[in-house]
From Swiss-Prot:
It comes from the Bacteria. Disruption phenotype: When mntA-hepT is deleted, has a sight reduction in swimming motility. This gene cannot be deleted when the hepT gene is intact. Antitoxin component of a type VII toxin-antitoxin (TA) system. Upon overexpression in situ or in E.coli neutralizes the effect of cognate toxin HepT. Neutralization is mostly due to tri-AMPylation of toxin by this enzyme. Successively tri-AMPylates HepT on 'Tyr-104'. Binds its own promoter, probably repressing its expression. The TA system confers plasmid stability in E.coli. The gene is mntA. This is Protein adenylyltransferase MntA. It comes from Shewanella oneidensis (strain ATCC 700550 / JCM 31522 / CIP 106686 / LMG 19005 / NCIMB 14063 / MR-1). SUPFAM superfamilies: Nucleotidyltransferase. Binds 2 Mg(2+) per subunit.
Length: 139
């Protein structure tokens, strides 16, 4: 298994994404748990949302340059849960500390709000399930 060339990732992304703000490595490579068949998970934040076709083409360029499958995520269009995973478990490869901190605070705030909303739904489901079980109804 080859060593990951972070400089190659940074250069290719900076050369191809206008107004790029942040680059993160996440998944198995950021945790040091990659294996022979692992893909490379990369997340980017730019001033504007990336076009899906352009993002796919860029992922293919990265895959060719790195000789590995690449999953390229645009954080502007990613789910709150995925953004939270990138911020809390990923490794920042490029960008300013200020941009990283602002994105992290925004993401964690949105994630906490989502968790609060989910909790109300979970509580309702649990209450309905318990009531059905108490009445002997099938779940």
């Amino acid at each position: 298994m080859q060593q990951l060339n972070e400089n190659k990732i940074i250069k290719l992304l900076r050369d191809n994404i206008p107004k790029l703000q942040l680059i993160y490595l996440f998944g198995s490579y950021s945790q040091g748990t990659q294996h022979r068949n692992s893909d490379i998970d990369i997340a980017v934040l730019a001033a504007d949302t990336l076009d899906n076709i352009a993002r796919w083409e860029l992922a293919q360029k990265l895959a060719s340059a790195l000789d590995s499958d690449v999953d390229l995520v645009d954080l502007r269009s990613a789910s709150t849960v995925l953004c939270q995973q990138v911020v809390t478990q990923g490794k920042q490869l490029w960008g300013t500390q200020q941009d990283d901190e602002l994105f992290a605070v925004k993401t964690i705030s949105m994630y906490q709000h989502l968790q609060a909303e989910r909790q109300a739904i979970i509580d309702d489901v649990m209450a309905n399930t318990a009531a059905k079980a108490h009445r002997g109804e099938s779940l």
